[in-house]
């Protein structure tokens, strides 16, 4: 069985993340969505909220394939999380050349530390290429319409978060 790991902060999960997740599911039997925990950062959504949003979004968008997705937290190196969970592939999404430059450096470092783990780059669909979680949070905080950028469960959660 091929297992892929897809790491990020997912604060919140966006349609861009879901696009990469769909691509990962074409390559692997199981995809682990790994939420990185950074002690110095204050996320908008708690870990439990992000897990719930990823799971709800996967069910809403991926339907039966959602059963092939699991969500974990990790701190430290993603390669350690990949090893712990038996992943052979590390999936990374690319929006533009800036992402490529950064991700190539990371793939090189990860490849040196964990040669058994193959990094796979998935170019973002043009329809989601400009979406970032940071911009989604900013738009939502100013009362803008974020529905084109996030799955329905995330739009509802953002609207609730910023109305309170």
Swiss-Prot record:
One of its GO terms (molecular function) is pantetheine-phosphate adenylyltransferase activity. It comes from the Bacteria. It is found in: Cytoplasm. Substrate binds at residues 9, 41, 78, 92. One of its GO terms (cellular component) is cytoplasm. Its cofactor is Mg(2+). The keyword ATP-binding applies. Homohexamer. PANTHER family: PHOSPHOPANTETHEINE ADENYLYLTRANSFERASE. Pfam families: CTP_transf_like (PF01467). Belongs to the bacterial CoaD family. Keywords: ATP-binding, Coenzyme A biosynthesis, Cytoplasm, Magnesium, Nucleotide-binding, Nucleotidyltransferase, Transferase. Reversibly transfers an adenylyl group from ATP to 4'-phosphopantetheine, yielding dephospho-CoA (dPCoA) and pyrophosphate. The gene is coaD. Signal peptide: none annotated. Its EC number is 2.7.7.3. This is Phosphopantetheine adenylyltransferase. ATP binds at residues 9-10, 17, 93-95, 103, 128-134. The lineage of its organism: Bacteria, Pseudomonadati, Pseudomonadota, Alphaproteobacteria, Hyphomicrobiales. It catalyses: (R)-4'-phosphopantetheine + ATP + H(+) = 3'-dephospho-CoA + diphosphate. InterPro entries: Cyt_trans-like, PPAT, Rossmann-like_a/b/a_fold. GO terms for biological process: coenzyme A biosynthetic process. Pathway: Cofactor biosynthesis; coenzyme A biosynthesis; CoA from (R)-pantothenate: step 4/5. NCBIfam families: coaD_prev_kdtB, cyt_tran_rel. The record marks 17 as: Transition state stabilizer.
């Amino acid at each position: 069985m091929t297992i892929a790991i897809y790491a990020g902060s997912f604060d919140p999960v966006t349609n861009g993340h879901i696009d990469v997740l769909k691509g990962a599911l074409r390559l692997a039997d199981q995809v682990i969505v790994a939420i990185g925990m950074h002690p110095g950062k204050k996320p908008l959504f708690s870990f439990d909220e992000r897990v719930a949003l990823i799971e709800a979004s996967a069910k809403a968008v991926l339907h039966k394939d959602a059963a092939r997705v699991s969500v974990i937290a990790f701190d430290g190196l993603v390669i350690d999380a990949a090893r712990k969970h038996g992943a052979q592939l590390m999936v990374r999404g690319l929006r533009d050349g800036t992402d490529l430059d950064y991700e190539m450096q990371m793939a090189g470092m990860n490849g040196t530390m964990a040669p058994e783990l193959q990094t796979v780059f998935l170019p973002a669909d043009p329809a989601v290429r400009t979406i970032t979680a940071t911009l989604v949070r900013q738009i939502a905080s100013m009362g803008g319409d974020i529905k084109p950028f996030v799955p329905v469960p995330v739009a509802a959660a953002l609207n609730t978060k910023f109305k309170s």
